[in-house]
From Swiss-Prot:
InterPro entries for this protein: Met_Sox_Rdtase_MsrA_dom, Met_Sox_Rdtase_MsrA_sf
Catalytic activity: L-methionyl-[protein] + [thioredoxin]-disulfide + H2O = L-methionyl-(S)-S-oxide-[protein] + [thioredoxin]-dithiol; [thioredoxin]-disulfide + L-methionine + H2O = L-methionine (S)-S-oxide + [thioredoxin]-dithiol
SUPFAM superfamilies: Peptide methionine sulfoxide reductase
Organism: Methanococcus maripaludis (strain C5 / ATCC BAA-1333)
Keyword field contains Oxidoreductase: yes
Domain of life: Archaea
Catalytic machinery residues: 13
UniProt keyword list: Oxidoreductase
Listed GO biological process terms: protein modification process
Assigned EC number: 1.8.4.11
Function field: Has an important function as a repair enzyme for proteins that have been inactivated by oxidation. Catalyzes the reversible oxidation-reduction of methionine sulfoxide in proteins to methionine.
Name recorded for this polypeptide: Peptide methionine sulfoxide reductase MsrA
Family: Belongs to the MsrA Met sulfoxide reductase family.
């Protein structure tokens, strides 16, 4: 297997985020799930009821020789609204908040640098949280590759 790295982003509904990233050249795999909460192995229901503190995230395994972490960050920033706390479009709740979870010091620094750049270009306050990655809990199978399974052509990234 090639040298791979992992990126995890929370940017609203994880179905849309996964659909965006899974199509990128250099992305080896994607998986939707939850990160950042206090309950071990939360269910989708627990997360949606606000009982676990988790964020809906997409877990991305990628080849850094083909796609850079900064490229993934740019996709993250350009495909959701980082100025709305606990909300993306019609989806409202803590689980939909904007998050970058980092695994390495380099990822943290790149995330913070990108945050500063976005903040300087915005009249609104950026509310994206940048946090050290914690345990990732995969969502139930029916959430995985949701739009691919549904053959939904509504999303055109």
């Amino acid at each position: 297997m090639t040298n791979t790295e992992t990126a995890v982003f929370g940017m609203g509904c994880f179905w849309s985020a996964e659909e965006l990233f899974r199509k990128i050249k250099g992305v080896i795999s994607t998986e939707v799930g939850f990160m950042g909460g206090t309950v071990k192995n939360p269910t989708y229901g627990q997360v949606c009821r606000g009982k676990s503190g988790h964020i809906e995230v997409v877990n991305i395994t990628y080849n850094p020789k083909i796609v850079k972490y900064t490229d993934l960050l740019n996709l993250f920033w350009n495909n959701h609204d980082p100025t709305t706390p606990n909300r993306q479009g019609w989806d409202v709740g803590e689980q939909y908040s904007s998050h970058i979870f980092y695994f390495t010091e380099e990822q943290r620094l790149l995330a913070e640098k990108s945050f500063e750049k976005i903040q300087k270009s915005s009249d609104l306050r950026i509310v994206t949280a940048i946090k050290k990655a914690s345990d990732f809990f995969p969502a139930e199978e029916y959430h995985q590759k949701y739009f691919m399974k549904k053959n939904n052509s509504i999303l055109n990234f």
